[in-house]
Amino acid sequence: MGIPNLTKGDAMRAAKHYRQLLSIDFNIEALAFVPGPDGTRGRRIHVLGREVRDRPGLVEYLSPAFGSRVALDGYCKANFDAVLHLAYPDHQQWGHA
C-alpha cells in the first residue's frame, strides 16, 4: 500500500485528522478518597479515559488507576496497541502500511 499523492493542503488536513484520532486524553484524573486514620484523607489517582459517545459527562476508563502521571504514561507506552484498540474499537487496523 503506497502513500497517495497529496497536495500540501490535503496532507495538512490528513495529518490533523490522524492527530485528532490519536489524541487520547491523558489528563483525565479521578480523585479517589482512601480512608485514612482521620477518615478524610484522599489521594489523587491518574487514569486514561474518554467521554462516552452520546452520553455527555459519562467517562469510560481505558486503563487501571495509577498513583502518578509517570506510571500512567509508562502503562500507555507499554500497552500502546491495546490502548488504541480500547480507545477506537471501530478502527479495524492500526498497523503499518
From Swiss-Prot:
UniProt superkingdom: Bacteria
Annotated keywords: Plasmid
Protein name: Protein ParC
Species for this entry: Escherichia coli
Source lineage: Bacteria, Pseudomonadati, Pseudomonadota, Gammaproteobacteria, Enterobacterales
Gene name of this polypeptide: parC
